[in-house]
C-alpha cells in the first residue's frame, strides 16, 4: 500500500477551503493544508502497519487464566464523515499453550487498527480476530466504548452518547458466566 501523499492532501484541503467560501491564502489558514496533511499522516498511520505484527512477540508463560487490559484509550476517524470518534477498548483473552504477549502489544494492536478510516464495529472484531489468529488463545473478548463526533457535532447532535460494541471468540462465545465476569472486571475501578 502506498504511503500518505502529503502534497495531494494539501491540494485537497485548499480545494475544501475554497469550496466552503474561505480564502486559502488568508493568514489564519495559509498553513492549514500542510498542518492537515501532517495530521492525516499521523491519524491514518495504521493504514501502513499490520496490527498482527505487534502480537508476534510472545513469552512462554504457563498461564491459562484471564488476562484483561482495560481502559485502553484510542481515537479513530469515522470512515463515513472523516470526523473523530474516541473512547476506550477493553481486551481480554485466555492464553493457551504458553503464548502470552506483552500487555503493551495489546494496546499497540488497538492503536494500529484504530488509526485508519474506520467503523467501531470493525475495530472491535479486527482486534479480536487478530488476537485469535496470532496467539491462538482459548478465547477472546473485546469491548469498545466510544463517542462519535458524527453524532455529537452534526446530524442528531447528541453529545455524550456512547456506543458499545463487543466481539467474543473461542470458549467465551458459549460461556455466559465468564463473559459476565469480564464485564464485571471492566466496570470496577
From Swiss-Prot:
Instruction: Supply the name of the protein.
Output: GTP cyclohydrolase 1
Sorted UniProt keywords: GTP-binding, Hydrolase, Metal-binding, Nucleotide-binding, One-carbon metabolism, Zinc
Q: Which Gene Ontology terms describe the biological processes this protein takes part in? A: one-carbon metabolic process; tetrahydrobiopterin biosynthetic process; tetrahydrofolate biosynthetic process
| Stored SUPFAM superfamilies | Tetrahydrobiopterin biosynthesis enzymes-like
Query: Pathway, per UniProt?
Result: Cofactor biosynthesis; 7,8-dihydroneopterin triphosphate biosynthesis; 7,8-dihydroneopterin triphosphate from GTP: step 1/1
What are the protein's GO molecular function terms? GTP binding; GTP cyclohydrolase I activity; zinc ion binding
Please verify whether the record's keywords include Transport.
no
Q: Where does Zn(2+) bind?
A: 78, 81, 150
PANTHER family found in the cross-reference section: GTP CYCLOHYDROLASE 1 (PTHR11109:SF7), GTP CYCLOHYDROLASE I (PTHR11109)
| Similarity comment | Belongs to the GTP cyclohydrolase I family.
